[in-house]
Amino acid sequence: MTQLDSRTEATTTRAFDQPRAEAAVRELLLAIGEDPDRGGLRDTPARVARAYREIFAGLYTDPDAVLNTMFDEDHDELVLIKEIPLYSTCEHHLVSFHGVAHVGYIPGRDGRVTGLSKIARLVDLYAKRPQVQERLTSQIADALVKRLGPRGVIVVVEAEHLCMAMRGVRKPGAVTTTSAVRGQFKTDAASRAEALDLILRK
């Protein structure tokens, strides 16, 4: 088991600690010189904690439970879902990044496919964690390989990082593109080119 797999497996056994999160937000407000007891901030620790519980919900969901439905369609060509919206959180600054994911796969020899909504849910699961875009892209691809046994998988993620837009270099509109290719898409240039052409075609 790789280090990445170990981290992914470990997160599925945790539970969100609401009181601890509220206390941490209160301490942060004090650290920046605010009064957490004033009217506008009195309920902020609880609200932020609830928001974090939702934003990081992917830490508490088993990927295998998402890809739990298969259909025997005897399909042996590319299945591609484009422009899946995603919202995630940069683990370096805990600031959002957002964009779209394009996910494609060629079913294995058994021709089994999964529901289209399952692919979107898988993207959400890995996006709703403290992340870096490179790892997010690879995790989606590897989960599909593990669960579907496809002949090939391709994942492309395009996202704008607010840690680059609202602070630091302050370059709003800059888009980062990452890709992960597995199986036939990695070994066969023609298959990869076909998929990328469909992904990039608007």
From Swiss-Prot:
Keywords: GTP-binding, Hydrolase, Metal-binding, Nucleotide-binding, One-carbon metabolism, Zinc. Zn(2+) binds at C90, H93, C163. It catalyses: GTP + H2O = 7,8-dihydroneopterin 3'-triphosphate + formate + H(+). GO terms for cellular component: cytoplasm. InterPro entries: GTP-CH-I_C/QueF, GTP-CH-I_N, GTP_CycHdrlase_I, GTP_CycHdrlase_I_CS, GTP_CycHdrlase_I_dom. The keyword Nucleotide-binding applies. The keyword Metal-binding applies. Pathway: Cofactor biosynthesis; 7,8-dihydroneopterin triphosphate biosynthesis; 7,8-dihydroneopterin triphosphate from GTP: step 1/1. It is an enzyme of class 3 (hydrolase). GO terms for molecular function: GTP binding; GTP cyclohydrolase I activity; zinc ion binding. Its EC number is 3.5.4.16. GO terms for biological process: one-carbon metabolic process; tetrahydrobiopterin biosynthetic process; tetrahydrofolate biosynthetic process. Pfam families: GTP_cyclohydroI. Belongs to the GTP cyclohydrolase I family. Homomer. This is GTP cyclohydrolase 1. It comes from Mycobacterium marinum (strain ATCC BAA-535 / M). The lineage of its organism: Bacteria, Bacillati, Actinomycetota, Actinomycetes, Mycobacteriales.
